[in-house]
Amino acid sequence: MYFDPKEVGKRIARLRELLGYNQEQYSQKINISRSALSKIEIGDRSPSIDLLIEIAELSGVTLDYLILGRTPQDGNKKLGMQLVISFLTELEKEL
């Protein structure tokens, strides 16, 4: 396992969408610019550990999920299920 900024960005974008925020709204919640969030979501910029912590707390997921993609165990159960469904749907499209 290793840190992949593109995968981290995809997970952040998926969380943002599941929470019902657009990039402008979400960037305000986590105190960064919309353009910075956009760069993070496409993997052009790596989020700081402080930002990852803030996103994890806001989204109800673990840092393990954000960084490594491990399914959240201590976070919001409903959101965790939505993430699993979203992941499986994306995987199915690739088949």
What are these regions (language model features)?
Residues 31-47, 68-71:
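Recognition helix of helix-turn-helix/homeodomain-like DNA-binding domains
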Residues 68-95:
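Short, charged recognition helix plus adjacent turn
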Residues 10, 20-21, 47-50:
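Residue-level signal for the short linker/turn that defines the boundary of a DNA-recognition helix
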Residues 20-39, 54:
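Short alpha-helical DNA-recognition segment
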Residues 50-65:
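DNA major-groove recognition helix of helix-turn-helix/homeodomain DNA-binding modules
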